Amino acid sequence: MLSSQTSTIFTVSRLNQTVRLLLEQEMGQVWISGEISNFTQPASGHWYFTLKDDTAQVRCAMFRNSNRRVTFRPQHGQQVLVRANITLYEPRGDYQIIIESMQPAGEGLLQQKYELLKAKLQAEGLFDQQYKQPLPSPAHCVGVITSKTGAALHDILHVLKRRDPSLPVIIYPTAVQGDDAPGQIVRAIERANARNECDVLIVGRGGGSLEDLWSFNDERVARAIFASRIPVVSAVGHETDVTIADFVADLRAPTPSAAAEIVSRNQQELLRQIQSAQQRLGMAMDYYLANRNRRFTQLFHRLQQQHPQLRLARQQTMLERLRQRMNFALDNQLKRAASRQQRVLQRLNQQNPQPRIYRAQTRIQQLEYRLAENVRARLSATRERFGNAVTHLEAVSPLSTLARGYSVTTATDGKVLKQTRQVKAGDVLTTRLSDGWVESEVKGVTTAKKTRRKKTD
């Protein structure tokens, strides 16, 4: 008879179902490391095998839709790391795991460490864009932290020599693989910052497996790159290789060669820019000289128009025109007087009264005398005005000033000297005298002291 304390009676099916649900709901997904044994792959494409260690084993299944993502062929005795769900095969009551992903054990553990460190540093803000330093443009000296025997160094130097042979390069050799590599890389970064010889650093190496590149996933290296005052370009492996150093660095280059391309200037492009600048400068200079030459020609013509000899010639021409006009006016007056006289004589001859003739002759003589006197007076006044004009013109003429012993001195630029500050020792001067020019060289300049007038009470 059943005990009254027994509350539930399970069937075998229900028991297995309950256990399966407990395993799946309570345990969820787990990571398991172990050795493969009894590996089989039937026609269905599923994988069945056992994972074991020194003291225990568990049945495993990996269905076709999951195992097609595995990049290697599992082998008997191979250590692997799997992500799986725990379950129970109800018909037989066998406890087993259903695997979702599989990696070789070493690489899988490294990947876990990588993800954990990445999450940690990202949470601390080491990947934030606000901390990224701009690269110098152009760089005046490049530091390279890598193996002195690796292909990466050869690629970097080859690109720098091709693009910018004059760019100085300082190599900080260090191991890039092995247990000692992270410490050496950190010391190389610190040494480059302490010496402060370059303004940009390339930190990297050539391609390899995750284990080969692991030095650049080291937390010490990441923090050294973040603390560097010199901008750092990471150049680790190939374009598909992404390390913690890439996230922390100020800029990530897909390859070492690409890093060299980024930090260097293209010499051919610089040469083209210089040639273009020279061409623009030449065109600007030609335009400037043409403008100055045109301005000089204009000033020269204006100076010629204001030359004393030309002004005197214009005044002489004006006086000649006045003289001609005066002579023409006198001739016209004389002709008109003679014409009037002739008309009067004709009228007298027609009337022929003797007294009137005598009176007319007397009147004519008086008129002739008055006319002659008037003409002589006007001619004398005109001549006097003409003489005064000539005297005035001669008085204001620069040539008259020169004839009185004065001179006019001009500098090499053609400007008339008025003050001593316009010349200096060694300048060549041109002095205009009344009868020619004298060229002289300044031996010295002495400025006369100005005397101040005393104020009177």
From Swiss-Prot:
The gene is xseA. It is found in: Cytoplasm. It catalyses: Exonucleolytic cleavage in either 5'- to 3'- or 3'- to 5'-direction to yield nucleoside 5'-phosphates. InterPro entries: Exonuc_VII_L, Exonuc_VII_lsu_C, OB-fold_nuc-bd_dom. Keywords: Cytoplasm, Exonuclease, Hydrolase, Nuclease. Belongs to the XseA family. PANTHER family: EXODEOXYRIBONUCLEASE 7 LARGE SUBUNIT. Heterooligomer composed of large and small subunits. It comes from Citrobacter koseri (strain ATCC BAA-895 / CDC 4225-83 / SGSC4696). One of its GO terms (molecular function) is nucleic acid binding. GO terms for cellular component: cytoplasm; exodeoxyribonuclease VII complex. This is Exodeoxyribonuclease 7 large subunit. Bidirectionally degrades single-stranded DNA into large acid-insoluble oligonucleotides, which are then degraded further into small acid-soluble oligonucleotides. One of its GO terms (biological process) is DNA catabolic process. Its main location: cytoplasm.
